[in-house]
Every structure is written in C-alpha cells, then in structure tokens.
Amino acid sequence: MGKPEGKVEDHLIKKAEANNCLCYKFTSPSNNGVPDRIVIGIDKFGVKHTDFIETKAPGEKPRLLQRIIHAEMREHGATVFVLSTKEAIDRYFRQFFEPEENANGHKIPD
C-alpha cells in the first residue's frame, strides 16, 4: 500500500500477527463508514477482544459519516478504535496484548 493510510494499516496487520491476533479486512456492502479492520485476539489478561479498527493517515480524522457509524456501533456494544499513526497502533497492542515489562526492560512472564 503506497498511501500513508496504507502504511498505517500495514503496521496494524504486522503487529496483529506478531501478537497472535487475527486481523481481517472489514467490508460491509451498502454500508459506508464502517471501520477498516477487525482485530480478534485474547489479551495478556485472558480477555477476548473483537475490536473494530479505523486506520487513518497521520493527522487525518474520521469523516462525519464514519463518526456517526462508529458512535452507532459503540451504542450497540462494539469497541471501535481510530488509529492514525504507527505509535498509536503500538500503544494499542502494548495496552492489551504485549506482556508487561519491568523496570529493567525485561518482559514479565504471563
């Protein structure tokens, strides 16, 4: 993917694979504004995740229709994230899927 958004999406896919998560392209025919990807996995606490991820190019925000659809999905119990940088994707995976590190930088075992 040559576009900046594509680079962000590629990073999401790589991080999902590295963290033993599924990362599916999400399309919903006749429904514009839905998130780009679904990440499915079990986090470092044993909690099952099915997260909808909207990837954007750095500095871009979701369009009005996307914001409306994301809000509607959240109102129905879905978890929706908008991630626009590689750093935001890294934070998402650190928060949920990557093992904690101690003060010395060593991974704390599960």
Where are these predicted regions, by residue range?
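Catalytic phosphate/metal-binding cores of nucleic-acid and nucleotide-processing enzymes, i.e., regions
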Residues: 1-110
